[in-house]
From Swiss-Prot:
PROSITE patterns: HTH_MYB (PS51294). Its main location: nucleus. Expressed in hematopoietic and non hematopoietic cells. One of its GO terms (biological process) is mitotic cell cycle. It is found in: Nucleus. Residues 326-343 have a biased composition (Low complexity). This is Myb-related protein B. Residues 54-77, 106-129, 157-180 bind DNA. It holds the Pfam family Myb_DNA-bind_6. It comes from Gallus gallus (Chicken). The lineage of its organism: Eukaryota, Metazoa, Chordata, Craniata, Vertebrata. Gene3D superfamilies: Homeodomain-like. Keywords: DNA-binding, Nucleus, Repeat, Transcription, Transcription regulation. One of its GO terms (cellular component) is nucleus.
Amino acid sequence: MARRSRGEDQDELHCQDTDSDVPEQRDGRCKVKWTQEEDEQLKMLVRHYGQNDWKFLASHFPNRSDQQCQYRWLRVLNPDLVKGPWTKEEDQKVIELVKKYGTKQWTLIAKHLKGRLGKQCRERWHNHLNPEVKKSSWTEEEDRIIFEAHKVLGNRWAEIAKLLPGRTDNAVKNHWNSTIKRKVDTGGFLNETKESQPLYLLVEVDDNESQSGTRAESQTIVPNWPVDISEIKEEDVSDEEVTGLQELPSELPAADLAEHNEEGTPDDVVPEDASASVASPYKWVVEAANYLCPTSVPALNEALDMIESDPDGWCDLTQFDLPEEPSAGSSSSSNSPVRQTPSKPTPSLPNVTEYRLDGHTISDLSKSRKGELIPISPHAEVSFGTPPSVLKRQKKRKISLSPVTENAPSTSLSFLDSCNSMTPKSTPVKTLPFSPSQFLNFWTKQDTLELENPSLTSTPVCSQKVIVTTPLHRDKTPLLQKNSAFVTPDQKYVVDNTPHTPTPFKNALEKYGPIRPLPQTPHLEEDLKEVLRSEAGIELIIEDDVKPHKQKRKQGLRRSPIKKVRKSLALDIVDEDMTQNMPALPKTICFKRTQPVNFLSRSLNLSSSNRKNDSGLLNRAFVQVQSEKMSYRKMPSHFRPPAPMTRAWKAVACGGTQDQLFMQEKARQFLGTLKQSHTSRTLILS
């Protein structure tokens, strides 16, 4: 993205709900949010007095300046502003105006677009209309660059976007928040392996000096101990800047060095023999692991491997106790982890001067400007003998260095100001190598026991085996869960529903202690069959006339099948006549199962029996056992229509007796005394 100059578009400041972005606010003016009353008052004043005298308009606001009032009107309240989406005509107009005026005159461009601000035109161009903006999908390499740069720079998206040609800061920010951040939180980048990269010599060659074919002995900057640099991806480098491994030419004028010193670089950047030696170029070699390591030293490689294995253990370099004046004879120290490093130069480089990168020097790079050199202490010879104290501690940590870029007109190594921070500005957070869900989904033995024997205040979630009991009988069936975890059912359970004890009943029953199982009460069909068979010698045959209507249940409510008492039964008495060859059998009553309706809305139809005596079996209030022998005749193929029930049976069945009426009246009086303090809850037992 193009960098805006300081004096460009002074009237392009974006006015939001606050005035904190208005420059040079003085006179004790507040920077608080504009209220709706202030907006309405400003609109009224502008309509009455116009936009010529903003100081007069600001005098009506005790805590607002004329700039605040003007910016509020021009950027927010002006009815001529267009804040909607851009049309194709507007986009085409912006492209034509950019070709005509360039990418700096946004105020002039905005004057040709009615209702648009210069800031809107600028953002529209840089984020959407610029042909250099990439709109393709993000690659893994770009994700890695954003990940590494974010560790160093944080949320400085404009600086990170400079490392990705063709990507805007807005696109980088959106991609981080939508994709990369989630991948980092889940540890997606931890398992990826680092690909090996070739060595690059990051130097600048002057155009005039590059024509000379003379080459001289070079000085190589070698750290005494491994300086850990965070992984920074290389930018796209042109062919004329870096081509393979290059060396500086033989002549490096002293005037160039003096020029760099005038720019703010310390004098100790130049070695002591720089003035005497004419040929003293510098060579930087960036290895695949991004360390300043021009030579292949076994001990140094060992140290680098140790750093790679435990990057989070390294602490800040500014806290290291580094020796300032290492002795020349310390190269033979026995306790040095890099004592095997040869102190004499290699045959190919006879005059090699080694420089040590001090931790404080590296930290000072964050305060330097673009184009400055790295300050190096002017020691003629630095030994590898004395190891730093951090290597003795065997607790290492990576720190970040800014990536290196090149300046064409100068012969120096420059660092991008986008990567100036040497140490993290906030407490580093170590990414967890595991998922917290592993602990959340882990069940202990106690949890299993609690699920198998839930307390009175808990409601079972799902059950595979259910015992049909009364509401006061607790289900002791253990819960069988899939993979020892609650699984949301993916199907709707219609009739198979487990009875749930309502919470108010649970709370009321807790005071009476544990619930003991009670004998089965005759409210189920099986119990009715057994009672009628044993007491009256009647066999019940239940037939379904209409299939039960499937009710839709919410997903997650799993209930086991339970048979409820039928609210409406049609009693059909089977003919007593049986074949003479069959023995005496108990009488059979056929119950036809009908659709569930209100118990009091329908009358019970009783079928009359074709007995020898005229008195029906159910014409009285109670069932009596008949002692007479049944005749052996064939059962008729069809049943006679049932006779209407008598008044005596209707009084007993429908609650018309004196004791039933008395209990109903008492119940109404009791319910009438209750206070309706809260909304009653509907109790669904089906």
